[in-house]
From Swiss-Prot:
Species the sequence originates in: Illicium oligandrum
Protein encoded by which gene: psaJ
Name recorded for this polypeptide: Photosystem I reaction center subunit IX
PANTHER family linked to this entry: PHOTOSYSTEM I REACTION CENTER SUBUNIT IX (PTHR36082:SF2), PTHR36082
GO biological process: photosynthesis
GO cellular component, one term: photosystem I
Membrane topology classification: Single-pass membrane protein
UniProt similarity note: Belongs to the PsaJ family.
Length: 44
């Protein structure tokens, strides 16, 4: 039971950190490359 409580207290914190950093990364990419639907270095 203690392991379940530890998991339930750690998982939301890790999810918040992950989604927060992902949102920050997307915001910075959109700030550096505005309105980029397709990046030029990905086109072959």
């Amino acid at each position: 039971m203690r392991n379940i409580k530890t998991y339930l207290s750690v998982a939301p914190v890790l999810a918040t950190l992950w989604f927060g950093s992902l949102a920050g990364l997307l915001i910075e990419i959109n700030r550096l490359f505005p309105d980029a639907l397709a990046f030029p270095f990905f086109s072959f």
